[in-house]
Each structure stands twice: as C-alpha cells, then as structure tokens.
Amino acid sequence: MTESLLYSGKAKNMFQTDDPEIVHIHYKDQATALNGKVKEKIEGKGQLTSHISALLFNYLTVQGIENHFQKELENGDALVRKVKIVPLEVVTRNFAAGHFASRFNVPMHKALKPAVHEFYFKSDSLDDPFINNEQILALEIADKKTISQMKEEAELINQKLINLFDQIGITLIDFKVEFGFTSQGKLLLADELSPDNMRLLDKESGKSLDKDVFRQKIGDVRIGYQTVLDRLNNKLIAGEN
C-alpha cells in the first residue's frame, strides 16, 4: 500500500491511503503550547493520544454521534474518513479556564451554566482568533445551517462526555472539537478527542490530567494521559467483559 503525505501538523501527520475516502493518521510524540511556538518531543505520547481518541470516538459512535473514526491500527495509528475540515474550532466550556477566565476576570473553574460554546477561526498565522456568528457568515466560512449544526453537535457531545468522565472520577472543564464534510456533503465530528484538546481534572485530587501539565511545566504530561486512558479502558473495555 502506497501512501502520500496530506498534512503535517503540530500533533499528527495525515496520509492518503489507496482508498480515496480513507486517511491514515499518525500521532506525533510531541507536545506543543502557544499555538506551536513551544514544542517538546515526548516519547510515547502519540500512542496515548491515539488510544484515548479511539476510545472516545467509539464511545460517541455508540451514543449516536457520527464521526470520522474508522479503526485503530496495531501500531497505534488510526484510519479515518476523509473530510474537508470547516476552518472553525468549536470550544465548549463547562467551567471557566484559560483565556475565558482571564478575558472576563472570573475565578478559575467557576461553573458556567449554561455551558458556553465559542467559535475560533483556524489560522496559525493569526493565532486562531475568536470569531462570532456574524463574522463567520460575512467571511463565508460557513452558512447558518452549518453553524447551528456544529453548536448542536457540540452540546450533544458535551453531555455524553460529561456523563462518561463523571463515571470515571474526572471533571470535564472544557474541550475543543472540529467538524468536516465528507465527499457526499455530510457533516461529521473529526480531528481528535484527547487531553491535547480538552481540560480534565481528577475529581479527588483536583490535579490536571491534560496538556495544561505541559503548558504550565508542572510535571510529566504522560502520567495524566495514562490515568485517563486506564480509566477509560476500565470503563469502556473491561466493563464490557
């Protein structure tokens, strides 16, 4: 099987397979911060990210949320459906953190009810700026139907993930998702689902189990990722037996 590189990003490489509708993803052993301005090689992180993402995509599939994930390969890589990504990040916030907390001068981890959904324009050169519905429409990035569908899907995903993480002793602070269109014009959840793009706190200790550990330089990011993976495995895999 011959593959050609489609995309090389901060966290993953994507290759075109012999099937025009299927893409091969390889997750890098790398952590980044400040939109890629800070990066560090971390051995084994790629497989942790891939395993967690596979478990969460499969869980959401069972929950009725369609996504691009197809299968995880033996080497820890993944096969996904090829989509044309909408250049928008959808960030869902259940508790104040990061830029939201500083922007509005609210206490860290203040509960947000209802959950806040925000759009950010995908542009490394512009540092992924916040963008509102009217700006999205004016710049012809997406139409009203797509904007509405993405927000509705983000809310559904939020409820499903809150429920899952609550059962394994983890609080879902916030997360980022992306969506893309298949060649048939169907909008699917895409990209990845891992502690790289969500904030997770251990309910008992209050410790971060996500990339904030790397951003804030407070330890080995793999420890938190492994904790998340172990708990998801125990719940979703071992729990089935």
From Swiss-Prot:
The GO annotation for biological process reads:
'de novo' IMP biosynthetic process; cobalamin biosynthetic process
Q: Which InterPro entries match?
A: SAICAR_synt/ADE2_N, SAICAR_synt_PurC, SAICAR_synth, SAICAR_synthetase
Pfam families noted in UniProt: SAICAR_synt
Source organism's superkingdom? Answer: Bacteria
Q: SUPFAM superfamilies in the record, alphabetically?
A: SAICAR synthase-like
Keywords of the record: ATP-binding, Ligase, Nucleotide-binding, Purine biosynthesis
Describe which pathway this protein belongs to, using the record's wording. Purine metabolism; IMP biosynthesis via de novo pathway; 5-amino-1-(5-phospho-D-ribosyl)imidazole-4-carboxamide from 5-amino-1-(5-phospho-D-ribosyl)imidazole-4-carboxylate: step 1/2
**Similarity field:** Belongs to the SAICAR synthetase family.
Q: Which PANTHER family match?
A: MULTIFUNCTIONAL PROTEIN ADE2, SI:DKEY-6E2.2
Protein name, as recorded = Phosphoribosylaminoimidazole-succinocarboxamide synthase
**Which lineage do the record's taxonomy fields give for this organism?**
Bacteria, Bacillati, Bacillota, Bacilli, Lactobacillales
